[in-house]
Amino acid sequence: MGSVGRLHCLTMTAAENPTPGDLALVPLVTCKLCLCEQSLDKMTTLQECRCIFCTACLKQYMQLAIREGCGSPITCPDMVCLNHGTLQEAEIACLVPVDQFQLYQRLKFEREVHLDPCRTWCPVADCQTVCPVATSDPGQPVLVECPSCHLKFCSCCKDAWHAEVSCRDSQPGILPTEHGTLFGTETDAPIKQCPVCRVYIERNEGCAQMMCKNCKHTFCWYCLQNLDNDIFLRHYDRGPCRNKLGHSRASVMWNRTQVVGILVGLGIIALVTSPLLLLASPCIICCVCKSCRGKKKKHDPSTT
């Protein structure tokens, strides 16, 4: 198996190692990641889109994508890739260490379960069992029983099963089980669910403005209010979450100053470029009209 895996890795490279007499004839290719010129024996071509990068950069990119991607498909690192290529598992296994590839497979499986409406995870922290979910109407809660710990919970909110109460009206709290304790949405709970995708998030310390790594939703840790559009962090100036951001007043003011500076800079750029666009617009319109007129004459049969 070791020799087969090594043979597969070698076939992924763009060329074989050149002989010493052919070094002067070896072409150099520019890597789109590090912008350095490398010989073909140090490059790797992706199978799906045929984009080529140096092997060292591709290894670093894959390891970073595995750690930050939560099991999502690893796409071609070229932002303007015309084929929108995706790396195959054989390529990933060839270029990253074994433990990194095992982590990728585990995260990929967890993501598949999360996106599958017929499967869900047991909410008990140390159970980690995949439970089957009966088919139902979209958004309709279904009773789910874990085959391992036999916990009965709701398929939508993952709280204890509430037959006569909706998920919104149910009171989430501590779920005692023989395996441990699952925290709900109390203010001091260390584990809460994302208000959008319901993924469990643990907060140890630091800022109270949270961003879900799964759906990128930004919310307040204490009251779960939506903060996607609160760029000035005004939520923590009033109400029950006043002064609970977790940062000093000076750092908050500095953050607001930076945001204002960025907005003012964009406004200045717009003001400076708008007269130039107005002056250049007649030339642009003339060029477009000339091009359209030329195409019309080309396709007009009376001119032939």
From Swiss-Prot:
Q: What's the entry's take on its domains?
A: The RING-type zinc finger domain mediates binding to an E2 ubiquitin-conjugating enzyme. The transmembrane domain is essential for translocation to the mitochondria upon induction of apoptosis. Members of the RBR family are atypical E3 ligases. They interact with the E2 conjugating enzyme UBE2L3 and function like HECT-type E3 enzymes: they bind E2s via the first RING domain, but require an obligate trans-thiolation step during the ubiquitin transfer, requiring a conserved cysteine residue in the second RING domain.
Q: Where, in this chain's numbering, is Zn(2+) 1 bound? A: C31, C34, C54, C57
Q: Which CDD domains match?
A: BRcat_RBR_RNF144B, mRING-HC-C4C4_RBR_RNF144B, Rcat_RBR_RNF144B
Q: What is its main location?
A: mitochondrion
Per UniProt, what is one GO molecular function of this protein? zinc ion binding
RING-type zinc-finger residues: 31-81, 194-223
Output the lineage of the source organism. Answer: Eukaryota, Metazoa, Chordata, Craniata, Vertebrata
- Functional summary from the UniProt entry: E3 ubiquitin-protein ligase which accepts ubiquitin from E2 ubiquitin-conjugating enzymes UBE2L3 and UBE2L6 in the form of a thioester and then directly transfers the ubiquitin to targeted substrates such as LCMT2, thereby promoting their degradation. Induces apoptosis via a p53/TP53-dependent but caspase-independent mechanism. Plays a crucial role in maintaining the genomic stability by controlling the degradation of multiple proteins involved in mitotic progression and DNA damage. Regulates epithelial homeostasis by mediating degradation of CDKN1A and isoform 2 of TP63.
What's any GO biological process attached to this entry? negative regulation of apoptotic process
Q: What is this protein called?
A: E3 ubiquitin-protein ligase RNF144B
Zinc fingers, IBR-type class: 102-167
Q: Where in the cell is the protein located? A: Mitochondrion membrane; Cytoplasm
Pathway-wise, it operates in: Protein modification; protein ubiquitination
Cystine pairs: none
